[in-house]
């Protein structure tokens, strides 16, 4: 893109991840040749009734079409609340915003069967906000034979690369994923070529299982500060059983989700371990996340010198310490920090990425990295719902 590209302007990005606790939003200004400038951020939580409906839709059931449509409407309403909060805090009107990039809520991800489903009523969202909505980013990559995930590596390469060191950006959301940014890149300001050696894929479960277990036993939505895990001790026999999962042995490109790593998967793995105290299981689930991420980094980025964490797991110091320990145990001399050290608060990274993907859509520029997803080539991602 040239400086002063007509796609330049203010964009909103909304992301509700596999933790399903709510939607994160950012208002950001993109200009060709400059780093993104965040104007405001917001978080809007989901009511328990909506969370329950979304969890239920992840498993086959009766009357799914009706339940899916109603949940999509409810999501659009919450997304609109987040947008209105961004407008208020940034001092903007809808006419000031070029477009809103919204991920939607993943309820099924089956790229091997040729589809992925991110729930949202984008038409309703456009009506409620009077902002152009760009949605459905993953399906074009899947149509081109890709995994449809992860989609954030192109954004990571633009913002977090370094000319001097190999970096890994690790998202610890419901599912963990990594982006490997080889040395020689660098924060590039939109409009510059991406580093074609960027790689990335999903590693395995993160908060999806950690949150599910603490909610089951403490009736809390997440393990605040990792305190529940800190009370326990890792059970190495259980950890070995959890690691005995074919997905962990698959080669990249690969992606996963709650379709695989859910409460049923965990309960099946826990058969024979009923004697363990709940806090010991929690400690072991935390170790599982650290081990699977560290294994993938050791396998694909042995020269990594820094791991920058984003997502909800960035607020869990016990998990971050476990990751640092797991990396060292595999012979990696890599510091672990959050993306705040690079100037981007960890809770903003994914919503920023989807604002950036909306910007790419308006520029009719590719949003995927085909070497990451396995797609036949780079594609313009998303579909437009005009205001």
From Swiss-Prot:
Is Kinase among this UniProt entry's keywords? yes
Per UniProt, the keywords (alphabetical) are: ATP-binding, Carbohydrate metabolism, Kinase, Nucleotide-binding, Transferase
Q: What class of enzyme is it?
A: transferase
InterPro entries from the UniProt entry: Anhydro_N_Ac-Mur_kinase, ATPase_NBD
A molecular-function term among this protein's GO annotations: phosphotransferase activity, alcohol group as acceptor
Tell me which Gene3D superfamilies the record gives: 3.30.420.40
Q: Which reaction does it catalyse?
A: 1,6-anhydro-N-acetyl-beta-muramate + ATP + H2O = N-acetyl-D-muramate 6-phosphate + ADP + H(+)
SUPFAM superfamilies registered for this protein in UniProt: Actin-like ATPase domain (SSF53067)
Which domain of life, per UniProt? Answer: Bacteria
- Binding-site residues for ATP, renumbered to this chain: 17-24
Known EC number(s)? 2.7.1.170
Write out the GO biological process terms: 1,6-anhydro-N-acetyl-beta-muramic acid catabolic process; amino sugar metabolic process; peptidoglycan turnover
Q: Which family does it belong to?
A: Belongs to the anhydro-N-acetylmuramic acid kinase family.
Write down the HAMAP family for this protein, in alphabetical order.
AnhMurNAc_kinase
Q: What does this protein do?
A: Catalyzes the specific phosphorylation of 1,6-anhydro-N-acetylmuramic acid (anhMurNAc) with the simultaneous cleavage of the 1,6-anhydro ring, generating MurNAc-6-P. Is required for the utilization of anhMurNAc either imported from the medium or derived from its own cell wall murein, and thus plays a role in cell wall recycling.
Provide the protein name: Anhydro-N-acetylmuramic acid kinase
Q: Which gene encodes it?
A: anmK
């Amino acid at each position: 893109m040239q400086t002063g590209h007509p796609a330049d302007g203010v964009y909103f990005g909304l992301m509700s991840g596999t933790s399903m606790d709510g939607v994160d939003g950012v208002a950001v200004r993109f200009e060709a040749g400059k780093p993104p400038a965040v104007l405001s951020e917001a978080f809007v939580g989901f009511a328990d009734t909506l969370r329950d409906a979304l969890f239920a839709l992840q498993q086959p059931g009766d009357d799914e079409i009706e339940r899916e449509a109603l949940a999509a409407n409810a999501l659009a309403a919450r997304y609109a609340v987040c947008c209105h909060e961004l407008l208020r805090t940034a001092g903007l009107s809808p006419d000031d915003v070029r477009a809103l990039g919204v991920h939607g809520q993943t309820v099924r991800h089956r790229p091997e069967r040729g589809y992925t489903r991110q729930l949202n009523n984008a038409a309703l969202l456009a009506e409620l906000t009077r902002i152009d909505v760009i949605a459905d980013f993953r399906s074009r990559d899947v149509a081109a034979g890709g995994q449809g995930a992860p989609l954030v590596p192109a954004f990571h390469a633009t913002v977090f690369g370094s000319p001097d060191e190999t970096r890994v950006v690790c998202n610890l959301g419901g599912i963990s994923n990594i982006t490997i940014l080889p040395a020689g890149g660098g924060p590039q300001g939109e409009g510059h070529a991406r580093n074609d050696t960027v790689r990335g894929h999903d590693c395995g479960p993160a908060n999806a299982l950690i949150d599910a277990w603490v909610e089951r036993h403490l009736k809390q939505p997440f393990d605040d500060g990792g305190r529940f895990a800190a009370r326990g001790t890792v059970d190495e026999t259980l950890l070995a059983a959890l690691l005995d999962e074919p997905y962990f042995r698959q080669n990249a490109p690969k992606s996963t989700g709650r379709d695989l790593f859910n409460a049923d998967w965990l309960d099946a793995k826990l058969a024979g371990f009923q004697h363990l105290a709940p806090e010991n299981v929690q400690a072991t689930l935390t170790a599982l996340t650290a081990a699977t991420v560290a294994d993938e980094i050791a396998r694909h980025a042995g020269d990594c010198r820094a791991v920058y964490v984003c997502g909800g797991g960035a607020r869990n110091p016990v998990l971050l310490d476990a990751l640092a320990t797991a990396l060292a145990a595999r012979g990696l001399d890599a510091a672990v920090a959050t993306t705040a050290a690079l100037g981007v608060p960890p809770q903003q990274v994914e919503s920023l990425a989807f604002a950036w993907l909306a910007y790419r859509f308006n520029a009719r520029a590719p949003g995927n990295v085909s070497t990451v997803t396995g797609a036949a080539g780079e594609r313009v991602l998303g579909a437009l719902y005009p205001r």
